């Protein structure tokens, strides 16, 4: 790995209870199985390490600022390997926006603020944050997330050139061509 141009490091979760399933909530955002240590050791050998993340939910990434790229692939299915290879070789533009917020720490998430919200009270979970769930909580509380809802690469590049308006003076409701 030290002499390689880059290292592709595949990390993530699995569909096991307590990791990434509908059976049980995660008690931690940390990647299991010492994956953070694997990133640290790999970066020590080759700092040009690209992380390919396979997970269905946000995870902690204490190394996020140390890697040149993170490719969030979620669970891409049977042809995921082909799709990831096409992205990495430049055959396809890696584009998309995050559908969730990645908190910096578990404590930043309102769902983990009390025993009423996690793990719940006698099989009942109380959403004390009311409408301020997900990205709304981070915005309202002015908490900077690791990656915000909507973070990601553009779907395309575009530019406007040689624009001209049909008039120099317009008011609200006017049609311009």
Task: Please give the residue ranges for each predicted region.
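Hydrophobic helix-and-loop "lid/oligomerization" segment in the mid-to-C-terminal part
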Residues: 1-66
